[in-house]
Amino acid sequence: MRFTLSWLMQYLDTDASLDFIISKLSDIGLEVDSVDCKKHLQSFVVVEVIDVVPHHAADKLKVCQVYDGVQTFQVVCGASNVKVGMKSVLAYVGSVIPKNQTVIKVAKLRGVDSYGMLCSRDELGIAENDSTDEGIIELSDNTYNVGESFFSCDPVIELNITPNRGDCLGVYGIARDLAAAGVGKLKSVNFCDITFDNTCYISPIEICLEVQGIVKGVYIKGIRNCETPKWLKEYLFSCGVKSISCVVDIINYIMLSFNRPLHIYDADKIAGKLVFRKIDDQIEFFALNDKKYLLGKENIIAVDLANRIHSIVGVIGSEYSKCLFDTENIFLECAWFDPVDIALSSRKIKLSTDSSYRLERFVDPEFLQDGLKLATKMILEYCGGSPSSIVSVQNYVHNDILLNFSPDSVRNIGSVSITRDEIFDFLCNIGCVVKNHDCDIWIVIPPSWRSDLKHSFDLVEEVLRLYGYDKILENPIPISNIEFPDNLHNKLRSVLLSQGMTEVVTWSFTNLEFAKKFGYDSDIMLIDNPINNNMNLMRPSVLLNLLQVISENQAYGNNDAAIFEIGQIYNINSVCGDNNYVVSGVRYGDNLPRNFYKTDRSVDIFDVKSDFFKVLQEMNIGYDSVDLVRSTKSYLHPMKSADVYFNNILIGYFGELHPSIVHLYEIKRPIVCFEVFLYKIPVVDLTRKEFVELRYQSVKRDFAFLVSKNVNIQCLIEVAKKTNVQLIEDVSIFDIYEGNGIDKGMLSVALSVTFRSVDHTLNDQEIKDASDLIISAISKGFNGILRSC
């Protein structure tokens, strides 16, 4: 939002300096992007041409003498319209031309020195769209004085207005906010005094509304679309708006002053009635910016009885009925439509205009009549004409919002020392109506132009904003003595990173067809409006997304990967607030990069088994606390996978992926994976166990048993441990063998057992007795036979 200081002063009565106003704007949340004092434009002055002679060496050049009120300058000019007595604009030596940033220097043109340049409208950046002027700019005698700066030196302020403050997209709204913050007083604009004596006829153009909104209009006949007044051109130029014609410039001025977009139609091009409706089917539209747009069902249009489209409502008008210099009869429209409808319409054709930018951020629906009357008054003043009575149609009613507001909440939330009277004044200054202000709870009605004030805490924010954020007292946050345990997820991340894995974060969506291959065809949560067809299901398992990551990495030549993700999974029974978190990991390729010291190998089930139990170990769940059962999941290898149970609850699985799944993702090597269902694991004590010093030496003994291939080896380990829990510290398998020397259907399973006592050194007899118990238990429980060396 750009405006000049003098424009602001039209509505704000204050003696405050420019620096103070800029500082206050930032303090109240209206961020100042820039302030341009236009020093670079002060070198363009109004001059009078006092002599013109032909150039002695060039037919198309003329040597001119121009007077700036102080001295005379010689300028070589090629314009065909230069003549003695005319007023034009001289760019002094050192000036920078606005159009192309050319720096003017002393030049010698065909042997004649030139001290400056006489400028055209185009070079000055003020060429009008319909202008046919050629050559240098010619100024009227009574508007400009010789020697004065052509451009106004009025400082231009540019603000970055946030989307919720559409009311400040007009200079009047900015002045109102400054006045509310104590910077001067807001000057009153009495729109009720605007009346027209010659509204004795009814508009020949009717309006019909088939969408939610309000439309008002007035027909003005017999206008003269003359040149725009100098002051208005300067205001528009300062805002970066090109002057088009007097009528168009007036409605742009109303929009920039009061945040009230309007639209003008050439009334002679409209067949009887304007109908505001949505489009039934796609249609091409030729806009007044000389571009074609393909309109769809999102667009609201204004169409006449001849089915000609005259505008995309709130966005842009048509080329056919735009207002030109020779237009005599106009229809002036002032409308309000649902901001969402305008936003959708604008985005459909990928066009944002000054009008749509404001309408989609909400404009005051109560200001239509006054805005229309003000625009009509200015058009009659500068262009003449005879207006009709105002025609109006609406199917939207703006209802006031009543907010229960406690003034004490400002002090409690904002930690400020502010009186009830000050709070009352601030609310009234921004346009609120305050009732019951003698009670503890006030009834506050926000003004119609503040769509962002919807809750009582919005009012608290408004008071604090105007009172000054710098006045909020420092209030140190109280320090609690409660010690919180480290976040479990962060702990698990550290563990898996130490395992050489890399964390990834993927979408919560996945592909339905792939999920079905994993057996997820029921209790799944489909997405009604997916981002694309490959993300049409809330993921029932993180594994699906990790496999997609592996597949994409392989396509880029990354043939070794170990990745994990901690995230949520979803099913049809999931509700808001569920925390169905899992830890999922995948390994692919070789376990180590190729190196000089070790021979790499392909990853296998034991790599992910280690990852799985590292996660459980971090949750203080030991290996001996869980049960391993051969997995029946269709997407896992039937002989190289296991489901893990804790207290008879399935808490996860690990293993090698089934070859058919590997083929589905077009992955070239076997993949091993794991998934821990964190949400199924009961709350456990995450505190670290105290360190226990081991004072006495351990003893290791190895045993090799012949057992049936059908024996659950996990059970074998557990039985061995239970024979003497006081002395047996650990039992692990270090070899499994079948083949030569072993009967068919049998396995040789080698156990390594560690013995240790916490209070003495073990003697040989104790070790022998404990070993005999192990041999006896395995012999009785599994028909195991101890192998001799």
UniProtKB/Swiss-Prot annotation:
It catalyses: tRNA(Phe) + L-phenylalanine + ATP = L-phenylalanyl-tRNA(Phe) + AMP + diphosphate + H(+). GO terms for cellular component: phenylalanine-tRNA ligase complex. GO terms for molecular function: ATP binding; magnesium ion binding; phenylalanine-tRNA ligase activity; tRNA binding. Disulfide bonds: none annotated. It holds the Pfam family tRNA_synthFbeta. InterPro entries: aa-tRNA-synth_II/BPL/LPL (IPR045864), B3/B4_tRNA-bd (IPR005146), DNA-bd_dom_put_sf (IPR009061), Fdx_antiC-bd (IPR005121), Fdx_antiC-bd_sf (IPR036690), NA-bd_OB-fold (IPR012340), Phe-tRNA-ligase_IIc_bsu (IPR045060), Phe-tRNA-ligase_IIc_bsu_bact (IPR004532). One of its GO terms (biological process) is phenylalanyl-tRNA aminoacylation. Its EC number is 6.1.1.20. Keywords: Aminoacyl-tRNA synthetase, ATP-binding, Cytoplasm, Ligase, Magnesium, Metal-binding, Nucleotide-binding, Protein biosynthesis, RNA-binding, tRNA-binding. The keyword tRNA-binding applies. It is found in: Cytoplasm. Residues 694-787 form the FDX-ACB domain. Mg(2+) binds at residues 452, 458, 461-462. It comes from the Bacteria. Its cofactor is Mg(2+). Residues 38-151 form the tRNA-binding domain. Binds 2 magnesium ions per tetramer. Residues 398-474 form the B5 domain. HAMAP family: Phe_tRNA_synth_beta1. Belongs to the phenylalanyl-tRNA synthetase beta subunit family. Type 1 subfamily. Tetramer of two alpha and two beta subunits. This is Phenylalanine--tRNA ligase beta subunit. It comes from Ehrlichia ruminantium (strain Welgevonden).
